[in-house]
């Protein structure tokens, strides 16, 4: 389902073709996308990015589309046949501050934490920053695997959700639409139930089926009596 089809379905289900309602449809869809991406960790919406740590600087900026961390690794001898990956352990800021209290505690980073937004010239950035422990002793290459916010189907025209699991987009958007229209409570409840059903199926796929196989987890069995 692309955005044109989704928009038409929302108008058809609600039987509302008013221009003001139509102008809010992008908001209905984007609110649904945000709810879904913060509820289900979809493997297909994960990417990796490499960057370079600055020597004697314990901070690293997160990508602009960052949602959450999957893994982070420091790569020594990057680009050679002797690359060495050191996967960092996620800790909280207090731990890193206590374990490595001064910038002079340098070495190959072993830990990281989400520090918070960076501040430059009294202006707070909207993007998060990571803190490393110990402070990098050199300009090591770092590889970040992370879940990201994809471009909305509203602006892109298509999306992974629209192509692979559109019920969650449709019913989530309808829920927002009926709330906007101040619809009957039983109607909103029915749409909410359909949305939760679709979300549960997507969560089963993203957080379950795509993280196991028959070799390690065994085949799924239904008890027969």
Locations of the language-model features?
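Glycine-enriched, solvent-exposed interface loops adjoining structured elements
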Residues: 1-225
């Amino acid at each position: 389902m692309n955005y044109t089809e989704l928009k038409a379905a929302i108008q058809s289900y609600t039987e509302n073709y008013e221009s003001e309602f139509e102008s809010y449809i992008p908001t209905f869809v984007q609110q649904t996308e945000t709810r879904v991406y913060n509820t289900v960790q979809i493997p297909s919406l994960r990417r990796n990015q490499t960057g370079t740590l600055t020597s004697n600087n314990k901070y690293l900026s997160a990508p602009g589309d960052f949602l959450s961390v999957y893994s982070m690794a420091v790569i020594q001898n990057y680009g050679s046949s002797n690359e060495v990956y050191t996967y960092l352990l996620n800790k909280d800021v207090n731990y890193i501050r206590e374990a490595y209290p001064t910038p002079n505690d340098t070495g190959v980073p072993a830990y990281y934490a989400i520090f918070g937004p960076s501040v430059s010239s009294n202006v707070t950035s909207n993007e998060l920053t990571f803190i490393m422990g110990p402070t990098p002793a050199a300009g090591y290459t770092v590889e970040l695997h992370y879940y990201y916010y994809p471009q909305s189907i509203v602006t892109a025209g298509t999306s992974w959700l629209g192509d692979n699991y559109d019920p969650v987009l449709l019913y989530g958007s309808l829920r927002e639409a009926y709330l906007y229209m101040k619809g009957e409570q039983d109607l909103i409840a029915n749409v909410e139930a359909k949305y939760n059903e679709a979300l549960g199926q997507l969560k089963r796929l993203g957080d379950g089926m795509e993280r196991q196989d028959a070799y390690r987890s065994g085949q799924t069995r239904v008890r027969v009596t």
